[in-house]
Amino acid sequence: PAGSSAFVNTGSGSLRLGGTVTFNVLNDPSTAVIAGTLELNGATRTFAVNDSVAAGAAIDLDVPALISGAAGFGITKTGSGAMRLSGANTFDGPTTVTGTLLLMNTQALGVPTASRTLTVNGASSLVLDGVGIGSANFPLSLNGSGNTLLGPISGALVNMAGNNTVAGAIALAAASQIASLKPGNKLTLAGNITGATFGLTLYGDGDAELGGALGTTSGTLTKYGSGTLTL
């Protein structure tokens, strides 16, 4: 409920989900936490997280819990709030992001099977917080310039801390922005980037490297910030 933070710890057991996980923390400066083990229980599950940034909570829902699931089932993040995944998750279905999703574990997105999809919707951000996406089996679809939850520098894909690599291909489903925020940090995009007529903007004071082919036919490549871009 609004105005009260939550802490859920499954201990040595697990919490078997039967529907949507909803956190309505509009007036709470604290971060809600789910620890232990979560089972997706035969479906792709939605985490609906509202935004309490006005109350001072940079992260609205922190999930260090291990998220497991049968083959083909994943997670959908909805709502304008920020959710952080820091467990070594074992699900292998699709991941869809609305709002902000932060990754703090190299296995936060689960097991890199060949059928994985990773979609960042419009006005939304996928944030790398000290980790990359090391498998090419996570093709990424970007749909815009990100949201403003992280401040004036935003992106559909944001490298917030560390020298990190996104190994998979990136498809631009709209004109999109990628941010490498901090000096001394580097974001490497190792896969090919495609997008027909859509443009790509690289933003921030961190470095960036495009290791694959940039396959837009008439879209523009724009660079802002003091970081170095290597093609």
Which role does the model predict for each range below?
Residues S4-T10:
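Extracellular lectin-like interaction modules
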Residues S5, L17, I153-L157, N164-V166:
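Short, tryptophan-glycine- and acidic/Ser/Thr-enriched carbohydrate-recognition patches
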Residues A55, G134-S135:
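Short, charged/polar, Gly/Pro-enriched secondary-structure boundary elements
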Residues N137-L140, G168:
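Short, surface-exposed loop motifs enriched in S/T, G, D/E and P with embedded aromatic residues
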Residues G144, A161, K182:
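Residues at the C-termini of beta-strands that transition into short coil/loop
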